[in-house]
From Swiss-Prot:
Domain of life where this protein originates: Eukaryota
Localization annotation: Secreted
Similarity field: Belongs to the immunoglobulin superfamily. CEA family.
Domain Ig-like V-type per the UniProt entry, residue ranges: 35-144
Organism annotation: Homo sapiens (Human)
Official protein name in the record: Pregnancy-specific beta-1-glycoprotein 3
Cysteine pairings via disulfide bonds: C169-C217, C262-C310, C354-C394
Motif window: Cell attachment site: 127-129
Signal sequence region: 1-34
Length: 428
């Protein structure tokens, strides 16, 4: 700190004596052009330390001065005042017992606390030459000593070149900056090493032996700096991405035997099979050799298309294959004919459609009384007559499965004398 004038031999008066002093100071409260400046020593203030608010450019013929906490010049914010005549010091409501005022108007605050940070106002008055009081303001920020940081990791045991890891510097500290070190060197930013916006979190993408550490983080503010203990990631051996081979991706429902094989083969891995994201349950229908690398399904249904995955595991964890989905061939099922009306009147339009569940989609054809009419799912005959009565059949065929099926219905057409078809319906 700079040189100080020794504190005067003073009379110490409580804030209640302020009223008399205020009357004295206000007597000389006239305009002035003098410029008072205030600076802090040290310039960066930390908790528990001392700070001196050092005043420069004091006017001549000083009558006295008043210090306030904040920028409001009122009794509530009044810390202390000094009257040159009589070297009188008066303490106000904002005085904490840690402030020392000097004859050069400087204010020493000892053992600074959080509550001390902020703005201070100095009001100075002159006497006798027609000048008036002058006000100076100063604000300081309190910095805490940085704590010793520690590094937390999303995963201390990542798979080599496979898994991402985030390292976070704890604790989160206000008014502080974060620095990272790897192998004792300032951290280089690459595509595999990225920092969060506030630099508190470090992201590592695809950790290798060259980026496993050790890592250190540092918390720094204007008054202190602290560095963490080193943290090194423990790389686990890289697992190969498994894949599935299969003897038939287009099996026929309830006919073809399927064999799934999980590659690559290794005695060091355990194999697990998954169906629709669930571990494949033990079932009489599912056969697995002892090593479990091969999965055999004696038959498959349309509800077992998958996806299928296999997983290889070592003692540290596992990795799954890409999913494989089967194209199960089935059908055609027994077709259905819509609508199911069987009675019509002459002059009405006949419109029938046929549907059968099938993969791939079935081929459709229509016959009337055993005589081929047309191919397709829909049959339309405008203004039917009694001659259109007979047995209507829809035949379906799946060329992939080699299966066929058919459905028939009897249609009766009444003579023109009636109106509207009968209400009775014959469900198929």
């Amino acid at each position: 700190m700079g040189p100080l004038s020794a504190p005067p031999c003073t009379q110490r008066i409580t804030w209640k004596g302020l009223l008399l002093t205020a009357l004295l100071l206000n007597f000389w409260n006239l305009p002035t052009t003098a410029q008072v400046t205030i600076e802090a020593e040290p310039t960066k203030v930390s908790k528990g330390k001392d700070v001196l608010l050092l005043v420069h450019n004091l006017p001549q013929n000083l009558a006295g001065y008043i210090w306030y906490k904040g920028q409001m010049k009122d009794l509530y914010h009044y810390i202390t005042s000094y009257v040159v005549d009589g070297q009188i010091i008066i303490y106000g409501p904002a005085y904490s017992g840690r402030e020392t005022v000097y004859s050069n108007a400087s204010l020493l605050i000892q053992n600074v606390t959080r509550e001390d940070a902020g703005s201070y106002t100095l009001h100075i008055v002159k006497r006798g030459d027609g000048t008036r009081g002058e006000t100076g303001h100063f604000t300081f920020t309190l910095y805490l000593e940085t704590p010793k940081p520690s590094i937390s990791s999303s995963n201390l045991y990542p798979r080599e070149d496979m898994e991402a890891v985030s390292l976070t510097c704890d604790p989160e500290t206000p008014d502080a900056s974060y620095l990272w070190w790897m192998n004792g060197q300032s951290l280089p930013m690459t595509h595999s090493l990225q920092l969060s916006k506030n630099k508190r979190t470090l992201f590592l993408f695809g950790v290798t032996k060259y980026t496993a550490g050790p890592y250190e983080c540092e918390i720094r503010n204007p008054v202190s700096a602290s560095r963490s203990d080193p943290v090194t990631l423990n790389l686990l051996p890289k697992l190969p991405k498994p894949y599935i081979t299969i003897n038939n991706l287009n099996p026929r429902e309830n006919k073809d035997v399927l064999a799934f094989t999980c590659e690559p083969k290794s005695e060091n891995y355990t194999y697990i099979w998954w169906l629709n994201g669930q571990s494949l349950p033990v079932s009489p229908r599912v056969k697995r050799p002892i090593e479990n690398r091969i999965l055999i399904l004696p038959s498959v249904t349309r509800n077992e298309t998958g996806p299928y995955q296999c997983e290889i595991q070592d003692r540290y964890g596992g990795i799954r294959s890409y999913p494989v989905t089967l194209n199960v061939l089935y059908g055609p099922d027994l077709p259905r004919i819509y609508p199911s009306f069987t009675y019509y009147h002459s002059g009405e339009n006949l419109y029938l459609s046929c549907f059968a569940d099938s993969n791939p989609p079935a081929e459709y054809s229509w016959t009337i009384n055993g005589k081929f009419q047309l191919s397709g799912q829909k049959l339309f005959i405008p203004q039917i007559t009694t001659k259109h009565s007979g047995l209507y059949a829809c035949s379906v065929r799946n060329s992939a499965t080699g299966m066929e099926s058919s459905k028939s219905m009897t249609v009766k057409v009444s003579a023109p004398s009636g109106t509207g078809h009968l209400p009775g319906l014959n469900p198929l």
